[in-house]
Amino acid sequence: NNLHFELRKLTKRSKIKMSFDYDAIIIGSGMGGLATASLLTQLKGFKVLVLEKHFKVGGFTHTFSRHGYKFDVGVHYVGEMQPGSRSRQLFDLVSGGAVDWAPLPDIYDKFVYPDFTVCASNNRAVYINELVNRFPHERSAIHKYFKDIDAVNLSIQTKTTASLLPGVLAAPVNAFNSAFNKLAIISTADYLNANFKDNKLKAVLVSQWGDYGLPPSLSSFAIHALIATHFLNGAFYPTGSAETIAQSIVPIIKGAGGDVLVNHGVEEILVKNGTACGVTGKDQSGTTFRFTARHIISYAG
């Protein structure tokens, strides 16, 4: 929804009186760049150019092969890809429905510690029961925890919806967003320490902290809740490896007259009358290129 709002804003920018090679140029072909290119192509009818410095598109969806086996560099599993979910619907739009998602087995994760192991089930109720049976003295805190992460997840969705509304309408929606406002400002560690006594249980609940990149002492509980709820219906993997994601999007861009160029490193964004209007850089051979567009979007990472 936020992305759709940004796409709408693109059409409201002041127009520069000059001819352009493309409607939009996107720097970087990671999933953010490719998703934006796909949506601009499909929803706005844009002719889009994607420029990638690397020799492959796709960002962390890259794969490589060794001795006949294929390995992913970034994608381990993805949550909320069950048919009918919001994430699946959005992804099907971005990919043209060309990516199939295979559910991982019932036990999709095992959290192995020196003296105990906990299995994460793709069935929410089964997972909660596993935690309660293993840590019965924390029963009430466990149930409260799941209510809290649900509340935060709902609040984030509400906050996203509010961002699409005019200010007068958004204000009361944000005012009632109490769960997000309260829990987003505390760390994951602070929440756990305030609600749980068992250190082993605390460790289990944050076993997936690597997915959001910060340890519990530094991460917002709201972000933790977003990731935790993301996997409550299990995990999925793209059939045929993660590279099928980029492979599904590139034809959408090219089919509308756009281009996706690898080995093209952007060195400068051109600006005219205070507005970005093009890019220059060099390709693999060292040849300088120059492209212009009404909209310049950078996903360089």
Annotate each predicted stretch with a short phrase.
Residues F20-Y22, S285-H295, Y299:
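Core beta-strand elements of the Rossmann-like FAD/NAD(P) dinucleotide-binding domain
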Residues L218-H230:
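Residues forming anionic-ligand binding surfaces in small-molecule and nucleic-acid pockets
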Residues Y113-F116, Q284-T288:
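Glycine-centered tight beta-turn/hairpin loop motif at sheet-sheet or coil-to-beta transitions
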Residues N2-A24, Q42-G45:
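Extreme N-terminal leader/targeting segments of oxidoreductases
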Residues P114-S219:
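Rossmann-like flavin
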Residues A228-D283, T287:
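Helical element adjacent to the flavin cofactor pocket in flavoenzyme catalytic cores
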Residues F20-L154:
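N-terminal glycine-rich phosphate/pyrophosphate-binding loop and immediately adjacent elements
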